[in-house]
């Protein structure tokens, strides 16, 4: 699809707005065993003009250890094999930061946009842990660990996003077919992930990011992003997750299951449930 995605905005009255999203310029497989693409990623990270990288990999993507406190086998493999054979997300990022370090130690902002509390802190801890383990085995220098430990050099801004983006809906795919848009069928991967050439999402949205970018940044405000300090990000996240939004959504989900509803949207047509909210 030439890196194009069809954005389908779901509106309260059941209608949709459609827009082609053309902001993706390049798609690269972030795996060290794919030599050409791995070298391309190294080239990108070595560029001193790179200002930020961002993630949406779910909270599980930052986890290094299981409930028993030991490293997952795939993480232990990354630790034992070093940067040139990185496989997991955290190892890949740490390896690429090492490439940036070797190319001149240019600053960079490493931004998690996953919806979990203190996401920047979680990301930083995981990257630092990987670097420290590699340092023990002689794969990376003491100076590299110092480089990514210094937030004046490599920052890990906190963020909070409120954007409901369900998995690709069959009803949306059907409506696109009826409108003459071809090849929109969702695909289910071997890991039960639903992907499609379109993204369906609700219209209401906001993204709040801690303004800590040591190498400068794009004018994210122009895209509607709220730039602020860490304390404000934390307060906004706490408001959403524990006070105003998520608890209400969870309550509706529980009552909806009891009353036989399949969709929150259908629940909102129920007068008593809408008054509960």
What are the roles of these predicted feature ranges?
Residues 1-277:
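Substrate/ligand-engaging "lid" and interaction regions
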